Amino acid sequence: MKSTSATKFSVLAAATFAAAHGIVSDIKFDNDWYTSSLVYQDPYANPVPERITWSFFGSGNGPVADFTTKDIVCNGNAKAAALVADVKAGATATFYWTVWPESHRGPVMTYLANCGGDCRTVDPSSLSYFKIDHAGYENGEWISDKIIANNNSYSLTIPEDIAPGNYLIRHELLALHSAYDELGAQFYPMCANLKISGSGTANPPGVKFPGAYKKDDAGILVNIYNGLTSYQIPGPEPYKSGSGSSDNAAEAVSSAAAEEPAAAATSAAAEEPAAAATSAAAATSAAX
């Protein structure tokens, strides 16, 4: 659902997430705020809220157990979202995570995939994903630490020159605290349905999930405690609007979260039934 103001910010209290894991709780595209699929609230609501984000209720807030399987696309046994967010090319997207544990250091990566038709009926593993943003380790600091310092939020720009259409946006954090073991890297992916408008024509080449990440990739099988001086972010280089070249966006950590500092303490109670009534008008419905 789309909330009418930042006061709907539904980041869960830290006590809700006793385990050291996390999910995206909210997404903002420019000034439009959407509550994400909430794994510990939505399954017990009646009716279950419709979201723009794909749900993975059975997986909780933990990582994908095996990133060589289809679970790496949109998380474990992900189910298609009912709603679609209308987003302009060139918009700023801000992802708000639940309280992220400091020990879970690693990169952040975001991809887009053109669904061709309706993203709500597509097999996400059949799509081609092009990276639009990533950030990792720079000047001795992990991007995950910057995200924590910015109210557990991260911002990036939707490429302004991509062709309009229906897209999945795939956003993930990768925790590397156990990545010294094979399959020890912890991926936390999620997907959301977008309808991107604009006058662009770019259709960048992409990669497949699963397949884009290998067990022995330098940025996946790595010991971050062993004198790390540099880090290679997994996957391709990000598409840079207008040129097709890469663009490391480590500086894109969101400061927007500071606009509503009190909202970070808002519990799931903020997701009152009345807000659910606004969802049909706030996002594209199944009829769109």
From Swiss-Prot:
Lineage: Eukaryota, Fungi, Dikarya, Ascomycota, Saccharomycotina
Annotated positions binding O2: H177, Q186
Protein name listed in UniProt: AA9 family lytic polysaccharide monooxygenase A
Gene3D superfamilies named among the record's database cross-references: 2.70.50.70
Family (UniProt): Belongs to the polysaccharide monooxygenase AA9 family.
Gene that encodes the chain: LPMO9A
Residues carrying sugar: N151
BP term (GO), one: cellulose catabolic process
Record keywords, A-Z: Carbohydrate metabolism, Cellulose degradation, Copper, Disulfide bond, Glycoprotein, Metal-binding, Monooxygenase, Oxidoreductase, Polysaccharide degradation, Secreted, Signal
Organism for this UniProt entry: Geotrichum candidum (Oospora lactis)
GO molecular function: metal ion binding; monooxygenase activity
Cofactor dependency: Cu(2+)
PANTHER family, alphabetized: ENDOGLUCANASE IV, PUTATIVE (AFU_ORTHOLOGUE AFUA_1G12560)-RELATED
Biotech utility: Lignocellulose is the most abundant polymeric composite on Earth and is a recalcitrant but promising renewable substrate for industrial biotechnology applications. Together with cellobiose dehydrogenases (CDHs) an enzymatic system capable of oxidative cellulose cleavage is formed, which increases the efficiency of cellulases and put LPMOs at focus of biofuel research.
InterPro entries recorded: AA9, AA9_LPMO
